């Protein structure tokens, strides 16, 4: 494939394969996803397309093998709503998000609150993340970056590509599209395919959004779905994602992310996560316990120094610690902040 700046927008051809990799009858051949390019894979790779289709099974190898964040609650109490991060209703809905739901999704103003509550209840049954319980998916994050206007320009005017990794409902994808980014150049992936399917319910765009979504496990090296995009992305977005890992696993995740990017200066990793005034390892204050790393700016810079040493590349980190909704709650550790970042390949 030639430069993405000169190629036509990627298209997805659906076909029926009852026994495909994901166990679903609706998939897209990666050779059509990125025309004329199969990334050197010997096996045929198929990326399940959730555009207007049913939800797909989760791709995971289990927390013992991958180091993915452990369950937040015992399986027998998975639907427990007596935890401090479960809110019965949103205290308020961010005006930007409300505008997206009313103008992009055409949901009447007086129906927005009940609509998001209904979607949240379904999502809670999938996996009770704090961001689900607190309705934090209603707080768009990608547009908080000072780089956001330039990002929209790259996608809209330069025909560049973006992968939202750990996209949940892909709410930030919808923000990009509403601001003029071509939806066919944007991809989304999450451990839970159900979340991406609920995104279509939340935004009511199943028949119009041309983005491609697929379930994936970033730490599963055998995941051919993700390998199908290696070397093809101009930007990878990590929204509320990296705080799920300890320091060593974070280095491993970021190293894997670099393989998704085009190997050239200007390729970009950007995102937001739970951070801390002092980067350290602490037990996370949830019933399952666990030891995860809370980054400050210096520790995030160390991650990318190690990534650079492992890959023979150089990266520039721009980051900031901020207060934000859902950060600094009473049940969280002292010093919790929102950590936003952009990491540029030099």
UniProtKB/Swiss-Prot annotation:
Which stretches of sequence are listed as region Disordered? 1-22, 52-88
Enzyme class, one word? Answer: transferase
Q: Which UniProt keywords apply?
A: Methyltransferase, S-adenosyl-L-methionine, Transferase
SUPFAM superfamilies named among the record's database cross-references: S-adenosyl-L-methionine-dependent methyltransferases
A Gene Ontology biological process in which this protein takes part is: methylation
Gene name linked to the record: atr3
Q: State if S-adenosyl-L-methionine is listed as a keyword.
A: yes
Detail which positions bind S-adenosyl-L-methionine.
190-191, 217-218
Give me the reactions it catalyses. 4-O-demethylbarbatate + S-adenosyl-L-methionine = proatranorin I + S-adenosyl-L-homocysteine
Q: What is its EC number?
A: 2.1.3.-
Q: Which residues form the signal peptide?
A: none
What family is reported?
Belongs to the class I-like SAM-binding methyltransferase superfamily.
Subunit notes for this chain? Answer: Homodimer.
Q: Quote any Pfam family the record assigns.
A: Methyltransf_25
State the Gene Ontology terms under molecular function.
methyltransferase activity
Question: What task does this protein carry out?
Answer: O-methyltransferase; part of the gene cluster that mediates the biosynthesis of atranorin, a depside of polyketide origin that accumulates in the cortical or medullary layers of lichen thalli. Atr3 methylates the carboxyl group of 4-O-demethylbarbatic acid to yield proatranorin I. Atr3 is also able to methylate the atr2 product proatranorin III to produce the final compound atranorin. The first step in the pathway is performed by the non-reducing polyketide synthase atr1 that produces 4-O-demethylbarbatic acid composed of two 3-methylorsellinic acid (3MOA) moieties.
The protein's name is O-methyltransferase atr3
Pathway the protein contributes to: Secondary metabolite biosynthesis; terpenoid biosynthesis
Matching InterPro entries = Meroterpenoid_MTases (IPR051654), Methyltransf_25 (IPR041698), SAM-dependent_MTases_sf (IPR029063)
């Amino acid at each position: 494939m030639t430069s993405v700046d000169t190629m036509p927008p990627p298209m997805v051809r659906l076909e029926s394969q009852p026994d495909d990799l994901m166990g679903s009858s609706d998939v897209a051949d990666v050779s059509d996803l990125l025309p004329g390019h199969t990334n050197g894979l010997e096996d045929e790779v198929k990326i399940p397309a959730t555009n207007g289709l049913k939800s797909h099974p989760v791709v995971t190898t289990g927390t013992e093998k991958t180091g993915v964040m452990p369950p937040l609650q015992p399986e027998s109490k998975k639907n427990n709503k007596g935890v401090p991060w479960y809110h019965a209703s949103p205290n308020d809905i961010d005006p930007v998000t409300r505008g997206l739901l009313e103008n992009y999704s055409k949901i009447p103003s007086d129906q927005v609150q009940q609509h998001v509550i209904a979607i949240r209840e379904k999502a809670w049954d999938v996996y009770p993340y704090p961001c689900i319980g607190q309705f934090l998916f209603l707080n768009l994050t990608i547009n908080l970056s000072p780089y956001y206007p330039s990002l929209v320009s790259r996608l809209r005017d330069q025909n560049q590509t973006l992968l939202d990794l750990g996209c949940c409902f892909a709410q930030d994808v919808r923000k990009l599209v509403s601001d003029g980014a071509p939806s066919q150049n944007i991809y989304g992936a999450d451990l839970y395919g159900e979340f991406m399917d609920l995104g279509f319910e939340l935004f009511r765009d199943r028949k119009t959004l041309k983005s491609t979504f697929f379930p994936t496990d970033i730490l599963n090296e055998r995941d051919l779905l993700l390998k199908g995009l290696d070397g093809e992305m101009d930007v990878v977005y990590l929204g509320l994602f990296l705080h799920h890992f300890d320091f060593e696993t974070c280095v491993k995740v970021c190293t894997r992310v670099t393989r998704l990017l085009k190997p050239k200066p200007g390729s970009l990793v950007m995102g937001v996560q739970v951070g801390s005034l002092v980067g350290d390892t602490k037990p996370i204050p949830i019933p399952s316990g666990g030891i995860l790393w809370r980054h400050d700016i210096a520790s995030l810079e160390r991650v990318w120094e190690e990534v650079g040493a492992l890959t023979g590349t150089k990266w520039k980190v721009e980051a900031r610690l901020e207060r934000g909704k859902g950060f600094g709650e009473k049940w969280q550790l002292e010093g919790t902040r929102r950590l936003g970042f952009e990491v540029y390949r030099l």
